[in-house]
UniProtKB/Swiss-Prot annotation:
Leader sequence residues: 1-28
Cellular localization per UniProt: Secreted
Keywords for this protein: Glycoprotein, Hydrolase, Metal-binding, Metalloprotease, Protease, Secreted, Signal, Zinc
Gene Ontology CC entries for this record: extracellular region
Species per Swiss-Prot/TrEMBL record: Verticillium alfalfae (strain VaMs.102 / ATCC MYA-4576 / FGSC 10136) (Verticillium wilt of alfalfa)
Residue positions binding Zn(2+) 1: D12, D72
Pfam families cross-referenced by the UniProt entry: Peptidase_M28
Reported cofactor(s): Zn(2+)
Protein name: Probable zinc metalloprotease VDBG_06923
Fibronectin type-III domain location: 218-306
Length: 306
């Protein structure tokens, strides 16, 4: 591209900024239980500069960030070949955390937890709370940091140890992305407003709103979840640290087959610190989440062996 010429960025990423501005307006007079921060950061194309500064600012101040939602390129549901998916948004979710030590990564692999990073738990949480008849959207979880060999502003948050994911439209049109505005062989190039689908952007905004509101009003994630690794039994014994919240109603133990993308079962066990489930830890992935008196639930935390 000609870096000396002004170029529009209607989709990349005025669409995401528009979502943030509209949701900030909608929520301005409401009071979530936790703080929701809306931000439009600069310098993404120059090396994720704004996002790096923001993530490090939070980390240096020891801010508890329950989740970061990067909304980037959500302006159109029509791809380069004319394919249309007006009710789908992609959600990119990183696998094993970028901050894990070799020993931590080895333990994760030994228990089959490579698909259960904090980012993927955030992705499952978003899918559960935001893919419904009210948003009229399907959230397509992609098990990858970002599009193939590409990146975005959520990466610095992952590198800082936070759960972070990226929303992106289902099919990109590269005639309208990273292009000088021009007409060539009868084809209009450039990231122009005329190529946006505003109803699609509104549906993506509903997905984001459902996710962030649910996250902000749920009790905090459960920490230090363990499973008894020395007990030879077909039952599974789980332990966890208590969540300090006046909104806490109790905890749910969840599980799914090892090859299932989403949680398939949930068992409310009350306000306790341990639970024994009549299932073998060999055959399923377990997790624990907090449940609020208001009905909101936290993202899941998987157990590691004692």
């Amino acid at each position: 591209m000609n870096y000396e010429a002004e170029q529009p960025g209607a989709n990349d990423d005025a669409s995401g900024v528009a979502v943030a501005l509209e949701l900030a307006r909608v929520l301005a007079k409401r009071k979530p239980a936790a703080t929701i921060v809306f931000a439009a950061v600069a310098g993404e194309e120059q090396g994720l500069l704004g996002a790096q500064f923001m993530a490090q600012t939070f980390k240096n101040a020891s801010v508890n960030v329950e989740g970061m939602l990067n909304v980037d390129l959500v302006g159109s549901s029509v791809g380069s070949r004319g394919e249309k998916e007006p009710n789908t948004v992609r959600l990119f979710c990183q696998g094993p955390p970028l901050t894990e030590t070799p020993a931590q990564a080895s333990q994760r692999l030994s228990i089959g937890g490579e698909n259960d990073s904090p980012a993927r738990q955030l992705g499952r949480f978003i899918t559960e709370v935001a893919a419904n008849k009210f948003t009229d959207m399907r959230v397509a979880m992609i098990y990858r940091l970002d599009r193939f060999l590409r990146g975005g502003d959520h990466r610095p948050f992952l590198e800082a140890g936070y759960a972070a994911v990226r929303f992106t439209e289902p099919n990109e049109n590269f005639d309208h992305q990273h292009q000088d505005t021009r007409v060539e062989d009868g084809v209009q190039y450039g990231d122009l407003p005329e190529f946006l689908d505003y109803e699609y952007i509104a549906r993506v905004a509903k997905v984001d709103l459902a996710a962030m509101w649910s996250l902000a009003n749920a009790p905090a994630k459960v920490n230090n979840v363990r499973v008894n690794g020395t007990w030879l039994s077909n039952d599974s014994q789980l332990f966890w640290d208590p969540v300090n919240s006046t909104n806490l109603a109790g905890y749910e133990v969840v599980w799914r087959p090892t090859d299932a993308p989403l949680w398939t079962h949930a068992l409310f066990v009350g306000d306790v610190r341990t639970a024994t489930v009549e299932l073998s830890k060999d055959n399923v992935i377990f997790g624990v989440r907090s449940v609020g008196k208001n009905g909101y639930k936290s993202p899941v935390t998987i157990p590691f062996p004692t």
